[in-house]
Amino acid sequence: MAHKKAGGSSRNGRDSESKRLGVKKFGGEAVIAGNIIIRQRGTRWHPGENVGIGKDHTLFSLANGTVSFRTKVNNRSYVSVIPAAVEAK
């Protein structure tokens, strides 16, 4: 005869996979056109010059250059890419 009572199954024990959100390219980093700069939910950061936005609010570079972060008067954070041609001048 068994002397151990059958253990009940737990209702816990699951978790969703992390979505790997956040900044992928930081201020001052070089990017090429098409590089993902930020993955986000909603528009915590807004696209500035030479930055596009995907349908999932991902910000990506539209030109080769350097990433720049700044906050405007309306208290929104903007991400821009300063083109490489402008930097060289």
UniProtKB/Swiss-Prot annotation:
Q: Which GO terms describe its biological process?
A: translation
Q: Positions of the region Disordered?
A: 1-20
Q: Which GO MF terms are attached to this record?
A: structural constituent of ribosome
A Pfam match: Ribosomal_L27
Q: Name one GO cellular component term.
A: cytosolic large ribosomal subunit
Identify the keywords attached in UniProt to this record, alphabetized: Ribonucleoprotein, Ribosomal protein
Do the record's keywords include Lipoprotein? no
The record ties this protein, via InterPro entries, to: Ribosomal_bL27 (IPR001684), Ribosomal_bL27_CS (IPR018261)
PANTHER family membership: LARGE RIBOSOMAL SUBUNIT PROTEIN BL27M, RIBOSOMAL PROTEIN L27
Which family is it part of?
Answer: Belongs to the bacterial ribosomal protein bL27 family.
- NCBIfam families registered for this protein in UniProt: L27
Name this polypeptide is given = Large ribosomal subunit protein bL27
